[in-house]
A protein has these predicted regions:
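C-terminal cap/loop subdomain of S1 sulfatases and analogous C-terminal strand-loop tails that border
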Residues: 3-9, 13, 48-51, 56-126, ...
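Short acidic-hydrophobic sequence patches enriched in Asp/Glu that either
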Residues: 17-23, 43-46, 63, 67, ...
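Active-site rim elements
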Residues: 34-45, 57-62, 137-144
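Histidine-centered active-site microenvironments of extracellular/periplasmic hydrolases
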Residues: 1-39, 46, 99
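Intrinsically disordered, low-complexity polar regions and short flexible loop motifs
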Residues: 133
Length: 176
């Protein structure tokens, strides 16, 4: 599935942003031998999970250095998320300046919140309460009532960047 393009949401026209219109898309898997028809899940998954999932179902060892995680434990358990499953999805876009004019940014998305950092030639943070504001219209970054969760998200972001070995976003500029 492809999430398509913005149609004016957030004032944009592209799909490289970390907003829901760009990030959320359906994943449909049919494998009657192991997956019960009609199963659904709200587990946080990413495209890096596809390869380990296919390897796992094929009975092939998953390399230890692969970034994703197999979705098999979720798929064969009628969509139930294991207790030790990831708490956030990580996203990093670093191709600016390019024809799309999308600023470099990275961030995490948990079940309840999203934290985004635009960097390089700007330094802007956005944070959204996805339960109270699913359309991401009200940036709550820096608001006192969100200070505790903001601190937790900042720590989770750093931990997630270390996990995916993406700890120095400015290094991407040197490569490009």
């Amino acid at each position: 599935s492809d999430q398509g393009f913005f149609l004016g949401e957030h004032g944009w026209f592209d799909k490289r942003f970390m907003y829901e219109e760009c990030q959320r898309m359906p994943l449909i898997i049919r494998y009657p031998k192991a997956i019960k028809a009609g199963s659904t899940s709200n587990a946080i998954s990413m495209n890096v999970d596809f390869a380990p999932t296919f390897l796992d179902f094929a009975g092939v060892d998953i390399p230890s250095d692969i970034q994703g995680a197999s979705l098999k434990p979720i798929l064969v358990n009628e969509g139930k998320t294991p207790a030790d499953w990831r708490k956030a999805a990580y996203y990093h876009y670093y191709e600016y300046p390019a024809e799309h004019s999308v600023k470099r940014h990275y961030g995490i998305r948990t079940q309840d919140f999203k934290l985004i950092h635009f960097y390089n030639d700007i330094d802007e943070w956005e944070m959204y309460d996805m339960k109270a504001d699913p359309r991401e219209m009200n940036n709550v970054f820096g608001k006192p009532e969100y200070a505790k969760v903001q601190k937790e998200l900042m720590e989770l972001l750093q931990d997630t960047q270390k996990q995916y070995k993406d700890t120095d976003p400015d290094e991407k500029e040197k490569v490009l």
